[in-house]
């Protein structure tokens, strides 16, 4: 799928930034798994001077998804996230998607 529709804001992109990108097929959790496998030691999240690698993020997502599954969250369920923009939010977001559930954002 190409995202190539003319958009005014692209005039403000830094030089060399592509205006068209190829969006791969697959889910976000599948993409995270692939990236974690290819680049396990690369930083995925930097937050207040602390780094989380892609391997660490993937591990946290899988463990949180397992916890959600244990309490009964399943495909199609809606899960509200009321969290600040912090690493824990990223983990929760991907864990919900990993189960096939739907994230319902309620950012404070």
Model-derived regions: residue spans:
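Flexible, non-catalytic linker and terminal segments flanking ANL/adenylate-forming cores
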Residues: 1-25
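Conserved AMP-binding/adenylate-forming core of the ANL superfamily
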Residues: 22-24, 31-33, 41-94
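Anion (oxyanion) recognition and catalysis
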Residues: 97
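Structured binding elements
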Residues: 100
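Short beta->alpha connector loops at strand-helix junctions that form conserved
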Residues: 106-108
């Amino acid at each position: 799928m190409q995202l190539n529709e003319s958009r005014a804001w692209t005039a403000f992109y830094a030089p060399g930034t592509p205006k068209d990108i190829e969006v791969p097929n697959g889910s976000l959790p599948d993409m995270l798994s692939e990236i974690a496998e290819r680049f396990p030691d690369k930083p995925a999240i930097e937050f207040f001077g602390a780094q989380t690698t892609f391997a660490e993020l993937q591990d946290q997502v899988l463990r949180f998804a397992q916890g959600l599954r244990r309490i009964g969250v399943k495909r199609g369920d809606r899960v509200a996230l009321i969290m600040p923009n912090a690493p824990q939010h990223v983990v929760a977001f991907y864990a919900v998607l990993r189960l096939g559930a739907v994230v319902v954002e309620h950012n404070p």
